[in-house]
């Protein structure tokens, strides 16, 4: 199949390799550009655990050795892998989404034992900080990057003949719809199948478009949709 990848380039390139190894043709059409906040730093508090919902949140942080010994909860396998590559000794993945991660944290940790360090981008698809605070935790959120909107080159050529479009967040889905509308490609964009990481992603698309939703919100489940 001829598939359009809408993820930021840093995330899209490894995915392109995976798709091509499965016999697909992959076109990069990033809707967002990752811009690190190089000034981000972590206050020296006695955190009882760390949470992150994004691999990018860890990529651009200068991780001090004191943080690597603190338990880290990642939302999925990619953020877990990045945590392990950055030297976190007690990292584990739970939930697959923000709600599951918050529920696991509330079941495993006690708010009275110390604050939580939450590493994230400026915009998130769900409010993990609010969920943790509702469970009684004090949360120190550090934003380590911004995901800045960008317009892919030659979107008309990309959409023409595409069999599918991969969308990983509600924000990306909304940006895709805006791009299609501003380019006058509504009819052509209705032809491909839209492979969505979650129901929330699918809900951001027009009701008439063909959609397939991953059984779990991770890349393995997304790739399984293509089999």
Language model segments and positions:
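Signature of uroporphyrinogen-III synthase
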Residues: 1-227
């Amino acid at each position: 199949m001829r598939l359009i990848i809408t993820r930021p380039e840093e995330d899209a390139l490894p995915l392109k390799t995976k798709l091509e190894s499965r016999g697909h043709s992959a076109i990069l059409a990033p809707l967002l550009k990752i811009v690190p906040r190089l000034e981000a730093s972590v206050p020296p508090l006695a955190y009882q655990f760390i949470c992150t919902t994004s691999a990018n949140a860890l990529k651009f942080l200068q991780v001090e050795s004191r943080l690597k010994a603190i338990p880290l909860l990642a939302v999925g396998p990619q953020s877990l892998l990045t945590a392990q590559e950055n030297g976190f000794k007690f990292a584990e993945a739970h939930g697959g989404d923000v709600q599951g991660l918050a529920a696991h944290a509330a079941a495993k940790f006690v708010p009275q034992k110390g604050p939580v360090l939450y590493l994230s981008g400026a915009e998130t698809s769900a409010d993990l900080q609010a969920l943790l605070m509702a469970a009684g935790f004090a949360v120190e959120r550090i934003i380590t990057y911004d995901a800045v909107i960008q317009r892919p080159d030659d979107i008309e050529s990309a959409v023409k003949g595409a069999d599918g479009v991969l969308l990983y967040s509600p924000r990306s889905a909304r940006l895709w719809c805006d791009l299609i509308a501003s380019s006058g490609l509504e009819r052509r964009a209705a032809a491909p199948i839209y492979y969505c990481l979650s129901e929330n992603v699918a809900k951001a698309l027009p009701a008439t478009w063909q959609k397939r939703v991953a059984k779990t919100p991770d890349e393995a489940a997304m790739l399984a949709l293509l089999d």
